[in-house]
Amino acid sequence: MAADIRVFTCLSDNFGYLIHDPATGATASVDAPEAGPIVRQLEANGWTLTDILITHHHYDHVGGVAELKQRYGCRVIGPHDRKAAIADVDLRVAHGDVVKVGELLARVLETPGHTLDHVSYVFDADKAVFAADTLFSIGCGRVFEGTYPMMWDSLLKLRTLPDDFRLYCGHEYTASNVKFALTVDPDNEALKARAAEVTRLRAANQPTIPVLLGEEKQANVFLRADDPAIAVRLRMKGASAEEVFGELRERKNKS
């Protein structure tokens, strides 16, 4: 049976996600920014939390873990790196591992850059990827602990996923990402279409996520750092994809 995925807001701009397996009743939260909204969503749907899938150690992604584990006795799954940084982890995972949520299978991708321990969870059967703060819609995460080549390599891992997969990211940053992207890639028709959609969704107080990866591959300038046209726009003709990506990220940092 297909996963039932719910999207809601935690903190000010974090996305909360619940993934429910109708066949077994198992329910996972991807990260746990804070407990309250997750508990309310669980109660509204009559679900019990069985698992938390942690993507990285930043507090705005793990702040609710301890309270949820105490309340539900759920299993906490997290990246193998930085063992001391994430408390309450029961199962540590690495690239290529497969995690079961009931009968649902999540494949682990190591996607470092934003942090060194960052992982993404890919539900192949449900055509969904939870990329947290590595890949945003029309953007990507800041590179706090890794390097630009490392982050670019992580984006390439995500870019290889099929076009019909849906991206679920960590934050509602799409409107600001679109604003920046249009300064670099103003003639991109896919980007302009996404910009119009984002304006409509936000005006209706609706989330801009999920989004198809195929659309992101066309519209997200950070996924196109190896496109010679982007290098030309940045006056970096002949530069490597890693160099172009680094320049894009530096410009976004200052925007």
Curated annotation (Swiss-Prot):
Transmembrane residue ranges: none
GO terms, molecular function: hydroxyacylglutathione hydrolase activity; metal ion binding
Swiss-Prot/TrEMBL catalytic activity: an S-(2-hydroxyacyl)glutathione + H2O = a 2-hydroxy carboxylate + glutathione + H(+)
Residues engaged in binding Zn(2+) 1: 56, 58, 114, 133
Keywords: Hydrolase, Metal-binding, Zinc
Matching InterPro entries: Clx_II_MBL, Glyoxalase_II_hydrolase, HAGH_C, Hydroxyacylglutathione_Hdrlase, Metallo-B-lactamas, RibonucZ/Hydroxyglut_hydro
Xref: Pfam families: HAGH_C (PF16123), Lactamase_B (PF00753)
E.C. number: 3.1.2.6
Cofactor note: Binds 2 Zn(2+) ions per subunit.
Keyword Metal-binding: yes
Residues that bind Zn(2+) 2: 60-61, 133, 171
PANTHER family (UniProt xref): HYDROXYACYLGLUTATHIONE HYDROLASE (PTHR43705), HYDROXYACYLGLUTATHIONE HYDROLASE GLOB (PTHR43705:SF1)
NCBIfam families per UniProt: GSH_gloB (TIGR03413)
Protein name according to UniProt: Hydroxyacylglutathione hydrolase
